[in-house]
């Protein structure tokens, strides 16, 4: 059996990872990391707030936490490498660099969204962006009121695919807010906007707008189970890979 360590076991996705692995025929939860003060019982698994224990008892680690939590994990993994699947969004440049450095020692799979639908949507966005160069691009994402980072990592990934398809630098063309007398919209800019409310799991709309017509590509997640199942699939695939940095597209063969 593949021993899976869950980093962030008390979180929304972490709890679903535990549930989905309970009856898995290939992998099992061997250890769960939670913050100090949090009590959690997982039959057959060690529950700890020590990162080193998590690493020691895992064949592969799945991480769905916050950027600062992921940073702490990466720092310890650089000393004791183990395959890592991470879905934490909102990572800064330093944290991204730590992940890239770890990938030189062990296989690392990072994805801002683990769903098959989003993996395919990225491809559709790239093709549409390239073919419809005269169309304005606007991206709107909706999530629950508790999500801390904005825009979502998935929205930024979709924007990156759209920008690259047109040979643009996203950092130079992204607009994430409009207010006041700002003048006309430039042809190259890509709008990325975030809505927050209720218990929305996740909805992303990428719109391509022109005079007289428009196309909108939508993806709606109705359950976080899709993220948990995608991460488990990724973990099973990752353990047989060579050291390197991978995405969910690699796992799915896209």
UniProtKB/Swiss-Prot annotation:
GO biological process assignments: diaminopimelate biosynthetic process; lysine biosynthetic process via diaminopimelate
GO cellular component: cytosol
Annotated residues for binding of (S)-2,3,4,5-tetrahydrodipicolinate: 144, 153-154
Keyword entries, A-Z: Amino-acid biosynthesis, Cytoplasm, Diaminopimelate biosynthesis, Lysine biosynthesis, NAD, NADP, Oxidoreductase
E.C. number(s) listed in UniProt: 1.17.1.8
Sequence positions that bind NAD(+): 8-13, 87-89, 111-114
Subcellular location: Cytoplasm
Active site: 143 (proton donor/acceptor), 147 (proton donor)
GO molecular function list: 4-hydroxy-tetrahydrodipicolinate reductase; NAD binding; NADP binding; oxidoreductase activity, acting on CH or CH2 groups, NAD or NADP as acceptor
Catalyzed reactions per annotation: (S)-2,3,4,5-tetrahydrodipicolinate + NAD(+) + H2O = (2S,4S)-4-hydroxy-2,3,4,5-tetrahydrodipicolinate + NADH + H(+); (S)-2,3,4,5-tetrahydrodipicolinate + NADP(+) + H2O = (2S,4S)-4-hydroxy-2,3,4,5-tetrahydrodipicolinate + NADPH + H(+)
InterPro entries (UniProt xref): DapB_C, DapB_N, DapB_N_CS, DHDPR_bac, NAD(P)-bd_dom_sf
Protein family according to the UniProt entry: Belongs to the DapB family.
HAMAP family cross-referenced by the UniProt entry: DapB
NCBIfam families: dapB
Stated role: Catalyzes the conversion of 4-hydroxy-tetrahydrodipicolinate (HTPA) to tetrahydrodipicolinate.
Protein name per UniProt: 4-hydroxy-tetrahydrodipicolinate reductase
Organism: Nitratiruptor sp. (strain SB155-2)
Gene, per the UniProt record: dapB
């Amino acid at each position: 059996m593949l021993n899976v360590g869950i980093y962030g076991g008390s979180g929304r996705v972490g709890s679903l990872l535990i549930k989905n692995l309970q009856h898995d025929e290939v992998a099992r939860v061997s250890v769960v990391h939670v913050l100090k003060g949090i009590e959690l019982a997982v039959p057959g698994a060690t529950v700890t707030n020590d990162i080193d224990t998590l690493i020691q008892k895992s064949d592969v680690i799945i991480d769905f936490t916050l950027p600062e939590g992921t940073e702490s994990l990466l720092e310890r993994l650089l000393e004791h490498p183990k395959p890592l699947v991470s879905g934490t969004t909102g990572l800064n440049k330093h944290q991204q660099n730590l992940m890239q450095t770890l990938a030189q020692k062990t296989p690392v799979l990072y994805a801002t969204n683990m769903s098959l639908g989003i993996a395919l949507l990225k491809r559709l966005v790239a093709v549409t962006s390239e073919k419809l160069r005269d169309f304005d691009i606007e991206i709107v994402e909706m999530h629950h009121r508790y999500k801390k980072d904005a825009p979502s990592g998935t929205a930024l990934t979709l924007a990156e695919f759209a920008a690259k398809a047109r040979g643009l630098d996203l950092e130079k063309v992204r607009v994430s807010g409009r207010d006041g007398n700002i003048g006309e919209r430039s042809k190259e800019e890509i709008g990325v906007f975030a809505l927050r409310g209720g218990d929305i799991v996740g909805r992303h709309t990428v719109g391509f707008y022109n005079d007289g017509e428009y196309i909108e590509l939508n993806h709606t997640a109705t359950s976080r189970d899709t993220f948990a199942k995608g991460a488990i699939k990724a973990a099973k695939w990752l353990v047989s890979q060579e050291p390197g940095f991978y995405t969910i597209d690699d796992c799915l063969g896209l």
